[in-house]
């Protein structure tokens, strides 16, 4: 051993592997207002104590690695390390815990969801000492929130742009999602909009395929919405999907939509990525475009209860990155979504301040200060019989989208749109009169169908259609 090496070996550095809990489990720590707080569902491998598992998560998602390194002495780990500061056993599970971790704000680049997630949900999710790991919730401090632009416009600005108040926004996804020519696609858009819908929508996987290139689709959809506006006297829109293979191409498509005078564009924020989404959100605010967000790929990340990331975290991340609408499940349709959990993250999207609420799976109080709200979108397997429940669950500040529930009408697209508009307005009127939508919903729809043949036909077609399967992602059992 050289004298130089020998000196380093004996000056405050002891090589080797230490238990994570010696440095990263700190139950005495009081989180700071500026810390990012995370609640992880941790399932350790057999024989791994909960304290070691929680500390490993804190270490591997912040400053730690598997062995002691001499460069630890060149910085202040106490300033920068993540800390597991509290652990709760999960009721009803033998070896599963909710581990709470605090991260100093200096670990994260300002205004970057990409950087935040690279640390918090990075390599630690493949850590061998853990059988499974799920990020249940985040507390984003106000100091970090203020480094983000957030949604391009928000709920109130959108209502003012559209001149639509006192009810949910009504939409429709054009079907079939793939295979239509641009002209036939535009025809379907026109029929739905003139029938009474506020918006129509590109499906998430409609980008620029050989059967329908994006520029052709944009042109025919613009023609359709202008024609429908002229006939109805209402402001209309179509979510033009700007998602593309590169950020440059995505912005080019958004620019063309703006040049056509379209009011709104769309992005698939998970497959497109947070960097691309934030860039598009900034462009939309600067150029007066609304931004609709689809969550394609979310169930790969959030559906399994023990591993991945809960959608409430993805919803918070979207509010930071930017979007005016985001799909949020339906509770009553064909897609996963338990009522209490769904209402929890719907409030996280819309409200300025949300309290801890175990009954809805909200682990942290979350203030949003001046960040605009995001409209939740209910879409997927819904039809006119669901309208009372959707109105009661989501309220006015939402977007209700009926794809098959519009284009599947036996008389065509426009009558399908009429049926949905009549059903929505009947439910809003009944609610405003003090009627109980949960109890009287079917009666309200039948009464409205007496003076709307379009609604009566829709009621007959979908009277037996239900999607009743138990939810995969459920709230934990209560203690005791």
UniProtKB/Swiss-Prot annotation:
tRNA-binding is among the record's keywords: no
PTM note: The disulfide bond which can form in the large chain dimeric partners within the hexadecamer appears to be associated with oxidative stress and protein turnover.
Signal sequence annotation: none
InterPro entries: RuBisCO, RuBisCo_large_chain_AS, RuBisCO_lsu_C, RuBisCO_lsu_C_sf, RuBisCO_lsu_fd_N, RuBisCO_lsu_N_sf, RuBisCO_lsuI
Entry binding sites for substrate: 123, 173, 177, 295, 327, 379
Sorted UniProt keywords: Acetylation, Calvin cycle, Carbon dioxide fixation, Chloroplast, Disulfide bond, Lyase, Magnesium, Metal-binding, Methylation, Monooxygenase, Oxidoreductase, Photorespiration, Photosynthesis, Plastid
Protein name from the UniProt record: Ribulose bisphosphate carboxylase large chain
Taxonomy of the source species: Eukaryota, Viridiplantae, Streptophyta, Embryophyta, Tracheophyta
């Amino acid at each position: 051993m050289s004298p130089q090496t020998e000196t380093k070996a004996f000056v405050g550095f002891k090589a080797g592997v230490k238990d994570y809990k010696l440095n990263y489990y700190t139950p005495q720590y009081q989180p700071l207002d500026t810390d990012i707080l995370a609640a992880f569902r941790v399932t350790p491998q057999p024989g791994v104590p909960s304290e070691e598992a929680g500390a490993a998560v804190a270490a591997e998602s912040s400053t730690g690695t598997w062995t002691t390194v001499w460069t630890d002495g060149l910085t202040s780990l106490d300033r920068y390390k993540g800390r597991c500061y509290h652990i709760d056993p999960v009721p009803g599970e033998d070896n599963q815990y909710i581990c709470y971790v605090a991260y100093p704000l200096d670990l994260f680049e300002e205004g970057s969801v990409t950087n935040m997630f690279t640390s918090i949900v990075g390599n630690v999710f493949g850590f061998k000492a853990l059988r499974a790991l799920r990020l249940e919730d985040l507390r984003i401090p106000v100091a970090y929130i203020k480094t983000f632009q957030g949604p391009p416009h928000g709920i109130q600005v959108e209502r003012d742009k559209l001149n639509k108040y006192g009810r949910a926004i009504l939409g429709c996804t054009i079907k079939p999602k793939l295979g239509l020519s641009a002209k036939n696609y535009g025809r379907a858009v026109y029929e739905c909009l003139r029938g009474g819908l506020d918006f129509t929508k590109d499906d998430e996987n409609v980008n620029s395929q050989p059967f329908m290139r994006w520029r052709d689709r944009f042109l025919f959809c613009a023609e359709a919405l202008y024609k429908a506006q002229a006939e109805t006297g209402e402001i209309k829109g179509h979510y033009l999907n700007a998602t593309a293979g590169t950020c440059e191409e995505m912005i080019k498509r958004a620019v063309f939509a703006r040049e056509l005078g379209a009011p709104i564009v769309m992005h698939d924020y998970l497959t497109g990525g947070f960097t691309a989404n934030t860039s598009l959100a900034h462009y939309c605010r600067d150029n007066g475009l609304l931004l609709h967000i689809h969550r394609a790929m979310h169930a790969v990340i959030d559906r399994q209860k023990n591993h991945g990331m809960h959608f409430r975290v993805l919803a918070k991340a979207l509010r930071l990155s930017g979007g005016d609408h985001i799909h949020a499940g339906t509770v009553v349709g064909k897609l996963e979504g338990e009522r209490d959990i769904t209402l929890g993250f719907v409030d996280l999207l819309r409200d300025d301040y949300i309290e801890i609420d175990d009954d809805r799976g909200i682990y942290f109080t979350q203030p949003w200060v001046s960040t605009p709200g995001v409209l939740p979108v209910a879409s997927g397997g819904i039809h006119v019989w669901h309208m009372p429940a959707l109105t009661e669950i989501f309220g006015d500040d939402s977007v209700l989208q009926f794809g098959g529930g519009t284009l599947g009408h036996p008389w065509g697209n426009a009558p399908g749109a009429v049926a949905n508009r009549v059903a929505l307005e009947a439910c809003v009127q009944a609610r405003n009169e003090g009627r109980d939508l949960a109890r009287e919903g079917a009666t309200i729809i039948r009464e409205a169908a007496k003076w709307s043949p379009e609604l009566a036909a829709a009621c007959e077609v979908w009277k037996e259609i239900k999607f009743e399967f138990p939810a995969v992602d459920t709230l934990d059992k209560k203690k005791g």
